[in-house]
């Protein structure tokens, strides 16, 4: 277990991945098209990031935008994409499948988790669309996933902080709960103090429209989060 909470940053380009690493991120979630919540990155992007970035990289496995109810063809595509990500040296994968009842698709998620081994699986924020978070927690644990990325069912982690704290406690020693959605230097202290989470996820994608000045701003924002996480709780501000 890491001494300090781990910071995962979601990115969609090589430049952003490199800036996140320079800024102090501990891990990267690699996607494309973050405007729709992220989809599976291209083979070329995975290869480029793997060759240039030295911290762990987890690849999103999501064949399209929209809901998380996947056809059999889409499911097979996810399995193929997962195998490609594994072959390209990704350190983990991020995915989530629901049934038409909005509950976790345990069977097919477990199949993908088995295909991913020994890579860890993060079940993404499809979790927040389930009707009962505690039931969904047990379902995800049953799939063999290593962690859940969640806002606690709210629009943001700050708004879902109470549910997040309950999930962290309920999942302790069985699965990692990683708060995500709207996490910033302004609210990370309260989220960590309330939830006692050991990992946090932030996108910061709104500050990266330019490959020059705004990427320096992106790196600075990541650095602020990383600096806060490396301080003892009493010294965070």
Report residues per predicted region.
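Glycine-rich phosphate-binding active-site loops on the catalytic face of alpha/beta enzymes
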Residues: 27-39, 84-100, 145-158, 195-219
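Active-site-proximal loop/turn and secondary-structure-junction residues that shape catalytic pockets
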Residues: 13-15, 32-34, 63-65, 99-101, ...
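N-terminal amphipathic alpha-helix/helix-capping segment at the start of soluble metabolic enzymes
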Residues: 1-10, 14, 50-51, 233-236
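Active-site beta->alpha loop and helix N-cap motifs at the rims of alpha/beta catalytic domains
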Residues: 14-16, 39, 46-106
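Catalytic cores of alpha/beta
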Residues: 12-22, 69-84, 121, 128-143, ...
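Alpha-helix-loop-beta-strand connector modules within alpha/beta enzyme cores
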Residues: 38-65, 104-126, 159-185, 217-236
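Hydrophobic, well-structured mid-protein blocks that either form specific transmembrane helices
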Residues: 86-143
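Hydrophobic faces of well-ordered beta-strands that scaffold small-molecule active sites
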Residues: 5-11, 28-30, 49, 57-61, ...
